[in-house]
């Protein structure tokens, strides 16, 4: 059983170590909170690691210590779906930077308040930069916002990782309220129409012109496009690997799930298995490297008995027939 509010980090010689990563909105931390981090890391022999999402991870921890660590930090366990809004990265903006054009801290903290840990089709990351220098790496975020002299420019579909994608500009020169309103439309559109795919993958599947037209139609009040958004490939056919996939699987409808079945195939052909995978602690179903792995490899990384997992998955598949 995965300890509450922790992530499995490493399995070495059969021993599992875990990490906790408390949420720090905007990457801001008070001195007294920072002191608690140090005290806990020292007491439980943890290692402190700054993350790319402006948080502080405490890693190399034992499962039996996790509950006490959260209590001593004085925080609620950082819970949430793996496929959710994972982070809102914020630069100093006009509050702290001489080059800032807009108040990225105000906007970023409001986006954090609204969306952090909200469940999404895949993991989702935001970046808010107060000027075109884009210190929050906004053009490689699912939703990126960049301040200019004229207002806020909104970008969508960026990502880093093994298959990086630069975001597409959706709108420009918006004020604070319109930026929040447009982002809300983007998030709802993505939630409604996307499969288990990042925003950039979703845009590549339906086309940026279609995405932009639908979103801006609602934003401007001119009416949404009537035709439906194109769905997934027919599940009985051989699937095109998701971008970033490591392995091209051969699973089709009616096949039993085996050790060699690729995660991407399993969740697309048998979506009813998603709760089972999450229940076993395999929540990274939007990660290209994870979805491209055979079940046996993924189970090994998570320290799971693959035979037990296969039985549970096939039971769900059989019940659905």
Give the role of each language-model region.
Residues 244-321:
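Domain-level signature for proteins that mediate thiol-based redox and metal-cofactor handling
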Residues 130, 134, 139-197:
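Mobile "lid/hinge" segments at catalytic clefts and subdomain interfaces of large enzymes
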Residues 20-149:
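Small-residue-enriched alpha-helical segments and adjacent helix-cap loops
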Residues 128-133, 200-209:
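A glycine-rich phosphate-binding loop feature that marks nucleotide/adenosyl-phosphate handling sites
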Residues 46-52, 121-123, 192-205, 224-231:
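Flexible, glycine/charged-enriched surface loops at secondary-structure junctions
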Residues 39-42, 46, 74-78, 116, ...:
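Generic secondary-structure signature for well-ordered alpha-helical cores
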Residues 1-18, 226-248, 315:
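Extended, compositionally biased intrinsically disordered regions at domain boundaries
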Residues 4-28, 89-90, 260-261:
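Short glycine-/aliphatic-rich beta-strand segments at the starts of folded cytosolic domains
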């Amino acid at each position: 059983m995965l300890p509450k509010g922790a992530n499995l980090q490493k399995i070495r010689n059969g021993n599992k170590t875990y990490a906790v990563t408390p949420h720090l909105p905007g990457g801001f931390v008070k001195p007294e909170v920072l002191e608690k981090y140090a005290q806990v890391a020292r007491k439980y022999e943890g290692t402190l690691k700054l993350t790319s999402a402006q948080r502080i991870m405490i890693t190399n921890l034992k499962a039996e210590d996790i509950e006490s660590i959260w209590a001593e930090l004085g925080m609620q366990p950082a819970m949430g779906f793996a496929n959710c809004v994972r982070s809102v990265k914020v630069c100093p903006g006009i509050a702290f930077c001489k080059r800032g054009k807009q108040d990225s801290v105000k906007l970023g903290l409001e986006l954090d308040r609204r969306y952090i840990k909200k469940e999404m089709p895949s993991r989702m990351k935001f970046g808010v930069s107060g000027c075109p220098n884009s210190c929050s790496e906004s053009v490689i975020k699912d939703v990126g916002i960049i301040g200019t002299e004229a207002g806020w420019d909104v970008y969508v579909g960026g990502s880093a990782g093994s298959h990086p994608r630069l975001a597409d500009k959706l709108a420009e020169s918006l004020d604070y309220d319109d930026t929040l309103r447009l982002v809300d439309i983007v998030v709802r559109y993505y939630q409604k129409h996307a499969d288990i795919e990042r925003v950039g993958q979703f845009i590549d599947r339906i086309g940026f012109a279609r995405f932009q037209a639908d979103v801006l139609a609602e934003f401007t009040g001119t009416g949404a496009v009537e035709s439906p958004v194109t769905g997934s490939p027919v599940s009985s056919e051989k699937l095109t690997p998701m971008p970033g996939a490591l392995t091209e699987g051969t699973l089709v409808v009616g096949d039993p799930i085996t050790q060699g079945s690729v995660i991407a195939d399993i969740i697309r052909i048998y979506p009813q298995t998603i709760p089972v995978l999450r229940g076993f602690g395999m929540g990274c179903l939007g990660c290209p490297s994870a979805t491209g792995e055979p079940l046996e490899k993924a189970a090994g990384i998570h320290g799971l008995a693959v035979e037990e997992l296969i039985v549970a998955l096939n039971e769900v598949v059989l019940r659905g027939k």
